[in-house]
């Protein structure tokens, strides 16, 4: 029987007409939305200037009234991986947590992240605050002072890299499953979900601002180098690749925690009354058309915290034999087990002895 996937009526834009199209590949019916002539007429050219210095790394933030004018209005399909609901209370509880390296491989993975982060910080003009004075001052008057454009650049570059590991790892495991004629025990699905989620972060940010050509060039080079290196390292030792990604997600949580503090303290006035892009409240189920930039960043930080937990957990498992504990919830267990939400979390990852595998 064919199944029909529908979006919530509250999230249909005015002027959009649903049209059902059959997808032969998946055997499902999907709603696709097509812009009407009236919608195109009512969607004038954005006011934000497209002129940028080719060597300027800052992202040009769209005017508050321009945000919706950059929405994609044609052939919009549903997210392949529906996002779980995160409450505001649970999102506010998320914070930076560090898993101390325990083995030589852990130390190498952590040192690798420190090297990558140091280079990334230098290019984006960012300095991680270490004291309360640093947090309060925001490095005002120095090259490390973060503006709305610099924050968007950092987030866009971070998400363009963070979406690589899940895609590469799932591809390798897919080939491994085909080659050895056996099931993958749900690793592929979780890794694909992670890659998809990171890409949704990126697609959301590019609807808020336009990155410069210099930033785009760095993304091209960075993705090409990182993707190939991660592919080779994952073939050699997937365990420590997951540990590497766990530490990468720790830094992502740290970055977004700093971002949240700057929003809460009113240091980013351009973001105070901004309208979040349509793609955001169509993807995160608890967001609405009236949600704030702070609400959005809290959800993105929560996503990164969940990726941190997932990858630190996967690094603790037997890469060939153990199942992915996030792929299936086993009922009637007295001990808590991993889940896709934020109610039960372990920032340092679940140890193998704690899991029902």
Curated annotation (Swiss-Prot):
GO terms for biological process: alternative respiration. It is an enzyme of class 1 (oxidoreductase). GO terms for cellular component: mitochondrial inner membrane. Residues 330-357 are annotated as: Disordered. Fe cation 1 binds at residues 159, 198, 201, 304. Fe cation 2 binds at residues 198, 249, 304, 307. This is Alternative oxidase, mitochondrial. It comes from Scheffersomyces stipitis (strain ATCC 58785 / CBS 6054 / NBRC 10063 / NRRL Y-11545).
């Amino acid at each position: 029987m064919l199944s029909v996937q529908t979006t919530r009526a509250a999230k249909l834009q005015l002027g959009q007409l649903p049209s059902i199209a059959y997808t032969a590949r998946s055997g499902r019916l999907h709603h696709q939305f097509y812009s009407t002539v009236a919608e195109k007429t009512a969607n004038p050219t954005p006011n934000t200037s497209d002129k940028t210095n080719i060597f300027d790394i800052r992202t040009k933030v769209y005017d508050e009234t321009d945000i919706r004018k950059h929405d994609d209005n044609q052939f919009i399909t549903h997210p392949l991986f529906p996002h779980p609901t995160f409450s505001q209370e649970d999102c506010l509880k998320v914070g930076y947590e560090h898993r101390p390296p325990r083995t030589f491989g852990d130390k190498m993975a952590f040192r690798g992240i420190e090297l990558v982060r140091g280079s990334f910080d230098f290019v984006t003009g960012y300095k991680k605050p270490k004291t309360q004075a640093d947090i309060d001052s925001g490095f005002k008057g120095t090259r490390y002072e973060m503006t709305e454009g610099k924050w968007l650049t950092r987030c866009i570059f971070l998400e363009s890299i963070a979406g690589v590991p899940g895609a590469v790892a799932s591809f390798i495991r897919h080939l491994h499953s085909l080659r050895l004629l056996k099931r993958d025990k749900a690793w592929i699905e979780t890794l694909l979900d992670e890659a998809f989620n990171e890409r949704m972060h990126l697609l959301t940010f590019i609807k808020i601002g336009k990155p410069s050509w210099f930033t785009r060039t760095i993304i091209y080079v960075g993705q090409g180098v990182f993707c190939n290196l991660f592919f080779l390292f994952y073939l050699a030792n997937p365990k420590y690749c997951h540990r590497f990604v766990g530490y990468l997600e720790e830094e992502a949580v740290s970055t977004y925690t700093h971002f949240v503090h700057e929003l809460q303290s009113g240091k980013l006035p351009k973001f105070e009354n901004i309208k979040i892009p349509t793609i955001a409240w169509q993807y995160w189920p608890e967001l609405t058309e009236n949600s704030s930039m702070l609400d959005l960043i809290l959800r993105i930080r929560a996503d990164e915290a969940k990726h941190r937990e997932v990858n630190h957990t996967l690094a603790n498992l037997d890469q060939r034999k153990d199942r992915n504990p996030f792929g299936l919830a086993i009922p009637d267990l007295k001990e808590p087990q991993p889940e896709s939400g934020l109610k039960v979390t372990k920032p340092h990852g679940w140890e193998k002895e704690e899991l029902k595998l």
